[in-house]
Amino acid sequence: MSAGTATDTTDLDSFFSAHLAETDPEIAKAISQELGRQQHEIELIASENIVSRAVLEAQGSVLTNKYAEGYPGRRYYGGCQFVDIAEELAIDRAKRLFGCGFANVQPNSGSQANQGVFMALMQPGDTFLGLDLAAGGHLTHGAPPNVSGKWFKPVSYTVRREDQRIDMEQVERLAQEHKPKVIIAGGSGYPRHWDFAKFREIADSVGAYFFVDMAHFAGLVAAGLHPSPFPHAHVATTTTHKTLRGPRGGMILTNDEALAKKFNSAIFPGLQGGPLMHVIAAKAVAFGEALKPEFKIYAKQVIDNARALADTIISGGYDITSGGTDNHLMLVDLQKKGLTGKAAEAALSRADITCNKNGVPFDPQKPTITSGIRLGTPASTTRGFGVAEFKQVGSLIVQVLDGIAEKGDGGDAAVEAAVKEKVHALTDRFPIYA
């Protein structure tokens, strides 16, 4: 083809029509294998879920081609009239879901949403209060390796040793002592409800902003089955996956117009450039799904299933931190059995039950070893598991853990093989994307 001539039409036809399996069989194979893993394994990672085919379609749409720096009606690029529709729908649906006045749907993750709040409300070196990571907090709430722990001065509150519930007396004492600019409620491993009204009272007493990170339980809030951060919080952030069952991403919510402007500026141009419009469209689809009556039924089942799973594991002789759960997750404390989270995660994985090792309050083990595992019910509930199935899952987990307790970290191969067979029989009854 000579210089200056049009691209060969055969090449163009292939570019626009060839499927992934034709153009990149290695990636196509990896995706196919991951679909098989999701179909045949029981997913109990509390931060994971399974999205609808409609969400997949939106995220894989031509909106991936469009740059749209700025906000709807105020873009720095032309040709944004249709992606504006998608973002405006996402914003409107988010506000309806959570009963708030303002929503920023552009954060690429929950971590970036949290960073945006920090940028808007604090200066480097300012003090904030958050739940200790070891007690169920989150990396972005002041862990030393995270930017939140490097740029700011985190002060951590924890849970009471006797019942593993938030120590509100300690929260109040630390707030009075350190006078933080921001107080955070929320975390990644706390299975109980939060006293948002009391947190706001404490924040007001020291002139602090009250910030709720509801990444894990936002879907339960949207369904009206978990206390809402509003009207207590000055700001709330969330991921859009987990219990909200959307694409991976983040969001900032508030009722304060002045703060909303600060959050918008913090996200763009403060932290991000062009937003991911295909992901924002997928967020809008998921929010639309969450506004339907069926989502409330789903969210209630998530909670019922979590309680059934926790009760079954307790009946099997294992401890659950705080004695149970109010939401979608639980921490299994393995200390009295002499087990580690690392060994438990590996053994369950061999039986095709997926979870993650997790620290428990006052854990003597290193974060890479841990004394517990975290379990969650959103993904398996999405595929149709009910209370009966989760009781069976709990029994299977106990069998695998007992095998480690009896035979060491290598586990009981015969038990794990038998459990794996039962896992496949169960997952075959509940296909995904069939």
Swiss-Prot record:
The record marks 241 as: Plays an important role in substrate specificity. (6S)-5,6,7,8-tetrahydrofolate binds at residues 133, 137-139. InterPro entries: PyrdxlP-dep_Trfase (IPR015424), PyrdxlP-dep_Trfase_major (IPR015421), PyrdxlP-dep_Trfase_small (IPR015422), Ser_HO-MeTrfase (IPR001085), Ser_HO-MeTrfase-like (IPR049943), Ser_HO-MeTrfase_PLP_BS (IPR019798), SHMT-like_dom (IPR039429). It catalyses: (6R)-5,10-methylene-5,6,7,8-tetrahydrofolate + glycine + H2O = (6S)-5,6,7,8-tetrahydrofolate + L-serine. One of its GO terms (cellular component) is cytosol. Its main location: cytoplasm. Its cofactor is pyridoxal 5'-phosphate. One of its GO terms (molecular function) is pyridoxal phosphate binding. SUPFAM superfamilies: PLP-dependent transferases. Keywords: Amino-acid biosynthesis, Cytoplasm, One-carbon metabolism, Pyridoxal phosphate, Transferase. It is found in: Cytoplasm. Disulfide bonds: none annotated. The keyword DNA damage does not apply. Its EC number is 2.1.2.1. The modification N6-(pyridoxal phosphate)lysine is found at residue 242. GO terms for biological process: glycine biosynthetic process from serine; tetrahydrofolate interconversion. Pfam families: SHMT. It is an enzyme of class 2 (transferase). Pathway: One-carbon metabolism; tetrahydrofolate interconversion; Amino-acid biosynthesis; glycine biosynthesis; glycine from L-serine: step 1/1. Catalyzes the reversible interconversion of serine and glycine with tetrahydrofolate (THF) serving as the one-carbon carrier. This reaction serves as the major source of one-carbon groups required for the biosynthesis of purines, thymidylate, methionine, and other important biomolecules. Also exhibits THF-independent aldolase activity toward beta-hydroxyamino acids, producing glycine and aldehydes, via a retro-aldol mechanism. PANTHER family: SERINE HYDROXYMETHYLTRANSFERASE, SERINE HYDROXYMETHYLTRANSFERASE 1. Belongs to the SHMT family. Homodimer. This is Serine hydroxymethyltransferase. It comes from Methylorubrum extorquens (strain ATCC 14718 / DSM 1338 / JCM 2805 / NCIMB 9133 / AM1) (Methylobacterium extorquens).
